[in-house]
Curated annotation (Swiss-Prot):
Keyword Cytoplasm belongs to the record: yes
Binding residues for substrate: K30, R44, Y56, Y142
Protein name (database record): Inorganic pyrophosphatase
Binding site for Mg(2+) 1: D66, D71, D103
Provenance organism: Pseudomonas putida (strain ATCC 47054 / DSM 6125 / CFBP 8728 / NCIMB 11950 / KT2440)
Keywords associated with the record: Cytoplasm, Hydrolase, Magnesium, Metal-binding
Similarity comment text for this entry: Belongs to the PPase family.
Function: Catalyzes the hydrolysis of inorganic pyrophosphate (PPi) forming two phosphate ions.
Length: 175
C-alpha cells in the first residue's frame, strides 16, 4: 500500500483518513511508517512503560509544524491494527511542544459510518474526563526517561481548532 496515494480525507477537514502506526493499549513500542518506503518500522522501545491511550497515527499528505505528517489519536472501542487506515472525525487538539518543535495531536473518533458509539461526541470534552486526563498524562510523561527529549503541554482546543490544524497541514503539504 502506498500511503502517499491515500488522500487526507473524504470531506476535509471534517472527514479525515488516519494511517494507524500504534494501536491503543499496545506494548510500549514506538512504530513509524516510513513515508518513502511505506514500511512500518520499529522506531524505538519506549523507556517509560506506558501505553498509548488511543490509536496513534497520521493524516496522509499533510505537513505539520514538526516537518512530519499531522499526528492524530483516534479513540475507538477496540485497538486498530498498525498499517490500517481509518476514516475519522476530528473533535479536538492537544497542543504541545517537544524537542523537535510544535507537535500538536489531533483527537478524533471513528466516522459515524464506522461506529454509532461516538455519534454524540462533537468536541473532545464530550469524551470521558478520565480519558482526556489519560491522554494528557501520557503525552506529558512518555519521553521522561529518554535522554535529551522533553515535552511541554500547551493546552487543549476544540473541534474548530482541530479542523484549522488539518486545513493548515494540508496547505503546507501542497506547498
Amino acid at each position: 500500500m502506498s500511503y502517499s496515494k491515500i488522500p487526507a480525507g473524504k470531506d476535509l477537514p471534517n472527514d479525515i483518513y488516519v494511517a494507524i502506526e500504534i494501536p491503543a493499549n499496545h506494548a510500549p513500542i514506538k512504530y513509524e511508517i516510513d513515508k518513502d518506503s511505506d514500511t512500518l518500522f520499529v522506531d524505538r522501545f519506549m523507556a517509560t512503560p506506558m501505553f498509548y491511550p488511543a490509536n496513534y497515527g497520521f493524516i496522509p499528505n499533510t505537513l505539520a509544524d514538526d516537518g512530519d505528517p499531522l499526528d492524530v489519536l483516534v479513540v475507538t472501542p477496540y485497538p486498530v491494527a498498525p498499517g490500517s487506515v481509518i476514516r475519522a472525525r476530528p473533535v479536538g487538539v492537544l497542543n504541545m511542544t517537544d524537542d523537535g518543535g510544535g507537535d500538536a495531536k489531533v483527537i478524533a473518533v471513528p466516522h459515524d459510518k464506522l461506529s454509532q458509539l461516538y455519534v454524540d461526541v462533537k468536541e473532545y470534552t464530550d469524551l470521558p474526563a478520565l480519558l482526556i486526563q489519560q491522554i494528557e498524562h501520557f503525552f506529558a510523561n512518555y519521553k521522561d526517561l529518554e535522554k535529551g527529549k522533553w515535552v511541554k503541554i500547551e493546552g487543549w482546543e476544540g473541534a474548530d481548532a482541530a479542523r484549522a490544524a488539518i486545513t493548515k497541514s494540508v496547505a503546507a503539504y501542497k506547498g
